[in-house]
């Protein structure tokens, strides 16, 4: 698999990432996203997005400009968190990459793989990447308070 490169990334930085993907299937349940996050210097979402869109021919079928895809993924990564000062330890670009990788796993195993078309893969990968994009809240307690207040307003 030809590994894409982020603009400005040095060749010696790409080599460990290349070795990682040569020995780890991106759709395997055992995939170590946190190792990828370290190797890519917090760009696991970008690498997985580029690789999945190329591997499943989404780029070719939908005639997606890879520079625009790259820019989209870089923007998604850099703006994923709503409030960077909050440093939400869960709803961040790493979580988006984790859900993307897990989604790829489920799309390629079991009965779902026989029913999926490329358009479905396109939609589900974009949804997986951005499902918590700029999410303001971090925990269940916040949501419970929010929804309790909301429902009490109708009583």
Q: Predicted regions: what is each one?
A:
Residues 1-91, 107, 142-151:
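Non-catalytic interface/linker regions that flank or bridge core catalytic/transmembrane domains
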Residues 7, 115-117, 134-135:
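Arginine residue identity/basic-tract feature
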Residues 44-47, 94, 98, 119-120, ...:
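Generic recognition of stable, solvent-exposed alpha-helical segments in well-folded globular domains
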Residues 51-55, 102-106, 132, 136:
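Generic, well-ordered alpha-helical scaffold segments in large soluble proteins
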Residues 77-79, 102, 127, 138:
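Structured beta-strand/turn binding interfaces of compact recognition modules in eukaryotic regulators
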Residues 109-122:
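Short pre-active-site segment immediately N-terminal to the catalytic Zn-binding motif
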Residues 120-155:
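Divalent metal-dependent catalytic cores for phosphoryl transfer on phosphate-bearing substrates
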């Amino acid at each position: 698999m030809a590994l894409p490169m982020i603009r400005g990334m040095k060749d010696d930085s790409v080599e460990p990432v290349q070795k990682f993907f040569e020995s780890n299937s991106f759709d395997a349940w055992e995939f170590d996203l946190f190792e990828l996050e370290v190797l890519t210097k917090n760009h696991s979402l970008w690498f997985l997005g580029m690789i999945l869109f190329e591997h499943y021919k989404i780029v070719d079928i939908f005639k997606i400009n890879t520079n625009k895809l790259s820019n989209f993924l870089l923007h998604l990564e850099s703006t994923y968190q709503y409030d960077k000062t909050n440093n939400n330890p869960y709803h961040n670009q790493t979580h988006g990459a984790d859900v993307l990788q897990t989604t790829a796993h489920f799309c390629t195993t079991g009965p779902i793989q026989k029913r999926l078309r490329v358009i479905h893969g396109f939609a589900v990968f974009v949804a997986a990447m951005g499902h918590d994009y700029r999410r303001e809240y971090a925990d269940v307690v916040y949501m419970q308070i929010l929804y309790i207040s909301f429902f009490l307003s109708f009583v």
